[in-house]
């Protein structure tokens, strides 16, 4: 409500806005600020007046799912599920204080599932920007570390168009992001036994890892919820809007 009110106070036609709240992410007249999802981000983002900065969980989900939907590999009616692990900084000042209190409860030392009503505030943008007919069944989890995210979608390959293997899906995503300075796809042959959610903490990059076999695939996006999942994306969008180098001021 505050963001809507603030934008309403603008009385001229040349002020440009990047809104980091949820208020305008699916609103008419606003451009969704995920440059890598556009064929010409310098044009789409660079000329926009109103940019809605993506949500952190939505960033990971869309990085994995949106290209596959756009390329017609992922059917629009596919019943997607998504699991997303975040550090506690994603919960804002109140949650940070809870986790950093000296007398915090024992439950705060373990991962905690939330959003169990399946009405998370990022679902609307997840569905709209991916172009899916329904939002994913989304399970967010917060854990006892400060920053970093790992967002994963799960796929049954036989329901995808062309029935690609996990290796082929990795190549498809790698080709899609080949020229992007801030989003990359790990080589399929480089599959660690563990994927640490805080591996990219302190950076503004996002890395996709595709794992699985002929029948099933998981695609995991790892990034910093405070970087590519928040302020890093805002700076990237600002750079494009001002005609600067896209990565200016960002940590690669």
Where would I find each of the regions flagged by the language model?
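A generic structural motif
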Residues: 19-22, 184-189, 249-252
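Active-site catalytic microenvironments for nucleophilic, acid-base chemistry
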Residues: 67-71, 156, 240-244
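Alpha-helical scaffold segments in soluble metabolic enzymes
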Residues: 63, 67, 125-129, 233, ...
């Amino acid at each position: 409500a505050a963001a809507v009110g603030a934008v309403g106070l603008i009385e001229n036609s040349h002020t440009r806005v990047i809104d980091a709240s949820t208020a305008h992410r699916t609103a008419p007249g606003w451009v969704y600020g995920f440059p890598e999802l556009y064929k010409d981000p310098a044009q789409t983002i660079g000329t926009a007046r109103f940019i809605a900065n993506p949500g952190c969980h939505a960033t990971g989900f869309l990085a994995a799912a949106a290209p596959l939907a756009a390329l017609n590999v992922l059917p629009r009616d596919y019943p997607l599920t998504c699991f997303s692990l975040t550090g506690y900084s994603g919960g804002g000042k109140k949650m940070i204080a809870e986790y950093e209190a000296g007398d915090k409860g024992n439950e705060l030392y373990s991962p905690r599932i939330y959003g169990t009503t399946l009405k998370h505030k990022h679902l609307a943008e997840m569905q709209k920007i991916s172009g899916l007919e329904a939002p994913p069944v989304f399970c967010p989890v917060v854990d006892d570390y400060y920053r970093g995210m790992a967002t994963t979608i799960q796929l049954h390959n036989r329901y995808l168009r062309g029935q690609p293997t996990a290796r082929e899906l990795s190549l498809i995503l790698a080709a899609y992001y080949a020229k992007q300075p801030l989003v990359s796809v790990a080589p399929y042959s480089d599959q660690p036994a563990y994927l640490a959610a805080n591996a990219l903490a302190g950076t503004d990059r996002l890395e996709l890892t595709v794992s699985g076999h002929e029948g099933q695939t998981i695609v995991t996006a790892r990034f910093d919820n405070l970087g590519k999942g928040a302020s890093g994306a805002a700076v990237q969008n600002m750079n494009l809007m001002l005609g600067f180098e896209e990565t200016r001021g960002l940590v690669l």
